[in-house]
Amino acid sequence: VAELRSAYLITGTDRPKVTRALRRLRDRVGQEATEHLSANEASGEDAAAACNALGLFTVERRLVVVEDVESWKTADVKAVDEYLKGPAPTTVLALVGPGVKRDSALAKAVAKAGEVLVYDLPTRGRGNKADLPKWVEQQFHERGIQVDHDAARALVELVGEDAQELATEVDK
């Protein structure tokens, strides 16, 4: 099993894969050792303070998850960057934001101390429009089920373009 890094930025348009990546992290650290924050209410300083805080119970590892980090301002990113220069050794910081770009200051800061995980839906053509039928085919394939392109396209037409809804239908 690979060693956990100090920080992860989990981003991308493939919301189900982002959710699965976060679940895998939580499973490795433990649900009881996980603290959730929202960037809409918590600043970068708040996130750093949560990482540095000692938990009520002594645990081997802690996970601090901050959702919606694409809403953070420059000062928040700087606070996290400062924290990541000397991160708490027993804490894993997971920053989640579907709109965070790979070349953003936040992604660069996390890349120095941890790992940037980008899960995007496949695109087609120059318009960067998501190729959802292809994505649906991949989802079925990952579950050991073969479907043709027409069936995948029909599912997208029936369910719509929400990847989370499509993933739910594939799981059925």
Could you tell me what each predicted segment is?
Residues V1-K172:
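Conserved beta/loop motifs at nucleotide-recognition and modification sites
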